[in-house]
Amino acid sequence: MKLVTTTNDFAAYTSNSIEAIEYVKNAGFKYIDYSFCIDYKNKTGIYSADEDYIEKVIDKVRELDVCLVQAHAPFYSFIFDGDISGLIEDTIKCVRACAKWGIPSVVVHAGYQRNISKEENFRKNKEFLLPILEAGVQYGVKILTENFNKMEFDDIYWIDNATDLMEFIEFVNHPNLYVLWDAGHANLQEMSQEEELTKLGDLVLGLHIHDNYGDFDNHMPPFWGTMSMDSLMQGLFAIGYKGYFTFESENIFLSQEHRRINANDSRLLKAPLELRIKAESLLYEIGKTILKTYDCFEE
């Protein structure tokens, strides 16, 4: 299994995803998950006016000798209470970019809305996903949907477990829809990673690996929290998982948004970039140790 991490690890340090690719490479990762969240938030990258951006990424990937192997569509507010055509088109832009970069799959979150039933949620999400799924077929890119984190509001339903994921995929009934298993989100539910993965079987084409204490979606590295890595690894072996081991553990250092602010000086509001890259190197070593322990590490 090959180790991957996301460009979003460096979202606090750059609005330029090409720079983020360099930082990830400098930390030791060869395989990279391209986060369109950086582009969308800053109106850079594929959402900018730069007509040469796609080629610039291709050139940088070739120069650094890295591989873009997975992607994540922007995490919009995803509240289905208005016109969603713009969200659909913005996501299809990601699909087109993935095709040009040779990325085989992109993760697209399901949406939600207050005070609607599970059945209505499924219907609205199918309406949202179908044109994206068809674009994926056209461009040769698989669409992955993931289990979301534990819902804390009684008036909102969203898909946060394997059983509901299976039910949703059967409801959408499209051959280009697959699953990304988010292990950190599952840990919030106190569920068995192995049992949940076994329910999904060969529908699982991707992973998000991160940890937490079971009470908040912290997105910390493995061993920072309470997740059972053994249960996860046993589950991956049980389903014959052949994909990448992809980190989404950007909070090696707590995000600056959660840190108390000193009005007089903010030089250490976030860790210096050089230190953050060193921490990213530790993330690589953590992943390498996990995979070597289970005799499945691939360079």
Question: Where are the language model's segments positioned?
Answer:
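N-terminal pre-domain/capping segments
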Residues: 1-104, 137, 174, 178, ...
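Histidine-acidic metal/acid-base catalytic patches
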Residues: 1-4, 14-28, 159-181, 185-299
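Conserved beta-strand positions in the central sheet of alpha/beta enzyme cores
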Residues: 33, 70, 107, 144, ...
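Charged helix-capping and loop-helix junction motifs
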Residues: 48-54, 84-92, 121-129, 158-163, ...
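Surface-exposed cleft-lining segments at the edges of enzyme active sites
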Residues: 80-82, 111-122, 149-157, 217-220
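Basic- and aromatic-lined ligand-binding clefts that recognize polyanionic substrates
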Residues: 139-172
